[in-house]
Amino acid sequence: MTPIVLLTRLLVGAYPQWIGSSPSDKQRIYFANHTSHLDTIVIWSSLPKEMRSHTRPVAAKDYWVKGAIRRRIAIEELNVVLVDRRRSEHADPLEPLRDCLREGSSMIIFPEGTRRPQAIPSEFKSGIWRLAREFPNVE
């Protein structure tokens, strides 16, 4: 168990409850409400070890590449898919997510596109819908 997983499980108690599903190697998109930067680490740490190696959280590049500790957690520990939130005419923000799915990895995504302190989710961005249509065999 990696130090980040051990620490997260000790501090937060990140253990999954599989309701209506069970752990499997099937490619999936896990999605959740996003209230804190810890959400990514907690969800990823709660997965069984064999699933963590091929499950990549989606994270905002501008936040996770700032500072050596964040960058190490994001890139070396979590193997995140970094998304540039700045709008660009020439770049499709979903392309790194598509690449991840084409490679056969599962993903953890927060479809609201940002953190929200309230427990009730806000409106989802269209990206998760587009990915579901483009990758119908992914659960």
Short names for language-model regions:
Residues 10-139:
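Soluble catalytic domains of membrane acyltransferases
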